[in-house]
Amino acid sequence: MDPDKNKNPANHRLTRRRLMGGLAAGAAIPVLHELVPHRPVHQAFEGDAHAAAVHPAPAVEASTQKGGAAAHPDFAGGRRVNPRANGFDPSEMVRDFDYGKTRRMASGRVLREWTLIAEDKEIEVAPGVKYPAWVYNGRVPGPTLRCREGERLRVRFINGSSHPHTIHFHGIHPALMDGMPGTGEGKGGGVIQPGGSFTYEFEAAPFGMHHYHCHVLPLASHIAKGLYGAFIVDPKKGRPEADELIMVMNGFDTNFDSSNEVYAVNTIGFHYAHEPIRVKRNQLVRIYLLNILEFDQINSFHIHGNFFDYFPTGTSLKPSEYTDTIMQAQGQRGILELRFPHAGRFMFHAHKSEFAELGWLGFFEVEG
């Protein structure tokens, strides 16, 4: 059965307004009150009783709940998504860069190779909320592929899914390697049917922060269901040494109404509120940031208590601005560089209240 046609699965549904029951993150409460005055955020961190006292809930008829869904994630008592059940852990994913396998060609150039497999896989995006995803290599987002400018890249794609798929890389490459339906059929490229395979091969250019995704229609469905990943091309001379992080801003339409009910960085709502990202005071931190959010026109990243240098698309070694908030439309990406001069816990989140309420919120734990 095509999971897209299953419009009303009780275990998948979630409304945007009926949010979270309590995150058990008491240390976050003082910062939280400065974020947004909305009751759902206080529910997520402080529990229903305290939230009701501070922000009484307005009367809302059940029929007005978006999507009409009854099931929703429950964070009460510190409930969390089990990374082992999903087969991937956002705490590990944030520093996981896949360099593939390399060998020298006769010309002396480095050949870097990967294998990506598309599959159908149910994942949990919030406690009790299962989602019928399409994945590359068993995870959402797919592996963060990393290489160096000028290398020869070879990506073997195997479609193990029940649907036709491709891989479209952002970068400079021949038309046959574009992963675009209608370009390459008859030569093994274009749309790759279930059970089929194709090898994409091209030069790593230009350097910067890029990404890849399926390009089969309906495009919104293939992206929203999880077929995407980050693709980093390092400059030939590299970048200054840093603690490097990958953050993919995404979301999930859990009741299939073309509107997201869960927002996140690296797939699991509120994961980095439960498990803050640990960094060292005064150490250079580099964040590779990608917005692949479907159904919403824009996303944003804001950090508390600090500013960062921003390099749009990462194709220049000089930052474009020094700020604490940036916006990205779908497919936009960039590199953020910063140092934390103070120890302690600092929040980062989407500077759109609804996204933060529904999972796109976390913390840095600065040590030293």
What name fits each language-model region?
Residues E113-F231, F295-A329, H349-E365:
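Histidine- and aromatic-enriched segments that form or immediately flank copper-ligand environments
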Residues I232-V248:
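Low-complexity, Pro/Ser/Thr- and charge-rich linker/hinge segments at domain boundaries
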Residues H12-R13, H33-A106:
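C-terminal segment of N-terminal export signals and the immediately downstream linker at the start
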